[in-house]
Amino acid sequence: VIIDEAQRMRPEQFNKYTEEIGTLNIKCIFSYDEKQYLSDNEKEYNLKKRIEEELSCTPYILTNKIRTNKEIAFFIKQLFDSQTNIPGITYPHIELTYCKDYFSAKILLQTLLNEGWEIPSYTPGTRSIFDYEKYFPSNKMCAHSVIGQEFNNVAIVIDEHFKYTKNGKLTASNQYYSQRQMLYQIITRARKRLHIIVVNNASMLARCIEILNK
């Protein structure tokens, strides 16, 4: 049995699966990345710890994501940690555009969508309307629906809710779904080209320019 995205299981699911696996006396492979959570609940479940401490298993660690090329991987690493700097890298397949407001961002995103770019949105709310729903074009692709997929050309949005903590870690205003984690989920879908749209956020624009010009 192979359970992919195991870090997103609920505790009751983990209990049920492990009980059935033990009863049937079969082998199971849990594939997980503790960084790939979308809500704070998934982080608090800490399934990685339960898998490694409660089960008789041998963890194997993959050093790099297979789907992501080094250029994009280096950019992501520096974007999510402003204290990480990797000099001597060129980024010919990463584009950067700044929009001063949601209206211009929505126009640009629709243009990119028409040109064949994949634009997974941040997951919309079920009871509330979040700010990011105002600029994404109408499409059915969101952070939750693209889990496990990959695309050649991906466009992402970094709006005014993103900033760095005092220790340099990227963060965002928390909703029910973590916007920071949704960004990580979306940006790691890119296989060949990445287009970053920064909206009304001068400090994040400066960081992106700093990375691209190293």
Indicate where each model-derived feature is located.
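Conserved helicase motor core of SF1/SF2 NTP-dependent helicases
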Residues: 1-114, 121-214
